[in-house]
């Protein structure tokens, strides 16, 4: 196993460990590069498709935490390939704002992360849009 693979595995496992116990904000603070970005499938209400910078990602995550009741969450075992890893994530929640306000929903996605110098530099998220 290459040093790059080992470093990515370490970051991947730490992300899963934190997210599995609801410490998503801690994961962002600890594991993300300052210049990290997220790429979503599409824009959402009040949310751009591409979000740049750790500070902006933290602001988005903090708003989500304040406006969403989490009933349960899960994060699958990470699968690593070089400087990237994927994992399956699920969330059972009720939003207090937006088009899905007060409706309980289950969200499931596959996340593809890229790691450079021991930090997550990009997260791409894949999910079905009900098509």
Model-identified regions with their sequence ranges:
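A solvent-exposed, acidic/Ser-Thr-rich amphipathic alpha-helical stretch
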Residues: 5-6, 25, 29-82
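Ligand-binding pocket scaffold of soluble enzyme catalytic domains
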Residues: 61, 75, 95, 105-106, ...
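A short hydrophobic beta-strand element
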Residues: 81-93
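Short, cysteine-centered beta-strand-loop-beta hairpins and adjacent loop/turn segments enriched
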Residues: 66-69, 93-105
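Short beta-strand segments enriched in hydrophobic/aromatic residues
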Residues: 32, 91-93, 126-127
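Short beta-strand edge/turn micro-motifs at domain boundaries
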Residues: 106-131
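Basic/polar N-terminal segments that are highly enriched at the extreme N-terminus
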Residues: 1-10, 131
């Amino acid at each position: 196993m290459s040093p790059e693979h080992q470093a990515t595995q370490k970051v991947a496992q730490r992300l899963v460990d934190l997210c599995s116990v609801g410490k998503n904000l801690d994961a962002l603070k600890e594991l993300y590069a300052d210049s990290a970005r997220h790429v979503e499938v599409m824009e959402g209400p009040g949310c751009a498709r591409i979000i740049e910078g750790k500070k902006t990602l933290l602001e988005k995550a903090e708003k989500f935490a304040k406006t969403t009741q989490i009933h349960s969450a899960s994060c699958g075992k990470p699968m690593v390939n070089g400087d990237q890893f994927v994992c399956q994530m699920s969330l059972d929640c009720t939003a207090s704002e937006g088009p899905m306000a007060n409706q309980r929903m289950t969200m499931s996605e596959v996340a593809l992360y890229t790691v450079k110098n021991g930090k997550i530099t990009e997260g791409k998220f894949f999910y079905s849009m009900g098509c």
